[in-house]
């Protein structure tokens, strides 16, 4: 008995031939009359192609509506020319926009695809620039596709300089405002003797156009930046305070004979919070007089952090929280074991510490409620350096030791780690500045003379993904926010009037 094998030659459907059949009305079983406000276009098509290509026609032909059995259908569409081109696309054709302005074609493509129930992707709006007078048309489209990071980019890129921002909702304005904010590092380059700003995404630094001959800042603790007013303030080694507007590049204050100060922060355009001589004080920069002061028992803090308008002061067995605007003690957290590491979340809502018994505690800054208490696993404690909240993620704690970086999820208890490619023996502190970047404060002993060792801080920025790192030639890096677009400043002004 023999077997018979039959081979069939397979072929791919010739879409160009199929399209020509539609153009010539051959074997077509539906006529579409496409109408918009300006023109009417009549085309022939094949129901099976339309049915298989988009949800609109699938529903239309599968229902008992009269259109499902008609051979001619009138459809009111956003743009008949664009709609026709999309149908041509069902036949594998790529049709150019014709005489329609590219921006108009892109917007109407979104409207027509939405009409047909087709997927709308961001790529359809790539490189979109609309005329100022048609900005409201773009707003309607972004409302249709949904407000996300891509939509915010489009709006900010296209918003006219004279646009009335009060026409936008407060919710949208706040989202747009936040979208215009990014992060950078301000630092004084010791080699070049100039203030610079460092792009933390490409590691490129460029000079700030600040007044010439500004002296070297004393230290990180004696430098501060106020994002709201674009003000940089710092003390030099001669007890002089300099306040510079880095947006206008103007020196706004120069005050001599400042007291010995452990830490400073600008709390307004004209007021400076200072820690010195066992007291907190608020200095009026206009009058060079103290507005308020508060005597405290001890300013020899083990750790101290600014969390918004809160100054967190850590001693060996307790943590004090002070309001730096009214100089009031908010609360004290007392612990039974010595504190060996303290951190604050990037949104200034949480503080956390680790004690000598490896107990981890986390509190709400606003209410003082103890949110989490746990014992850190032994594997995290070897050659321990410190803890930090992951930037913009209050559920993840970064635990750093001299060999590894651990990420510990407080909610799930899951942990991940990466082994470092370089030694961290000199690291004494660190902070998380983005999701992947950490800023390490290191310390080394140098000898100017054989018997006079000098302790100096230096800073290293490291990427937690690939562990590439960059040495910063400075002792005062400030991780700050800034506006990437002038629209952000305008929105801030509008929101400030509410």
Swiss-Prot record:
Signal peptide: none annotated. It comes from the Viruses. Residues 28-99 form the BTB domain. Coiled coil: none annotated. PROSITE patterns: BTB (PS50097). It holds the Pfam family BTB. Gene3D superfamilies: Potassium Channel Kv1.1, Chain A, YVTN repeat-like/Quinoprotein amine dehydrogenase. Belongs to the mimivirus BTB/WD family. This is Putative BTB/POZ domain-containing protein L788. It comes from Acanthamoeba polyphaga mimivirus (APMV). The lineage of its organism: Viruses, Varidnaviria, Bamfordvirae, Nucleocytoviricota, Megaviricetes.
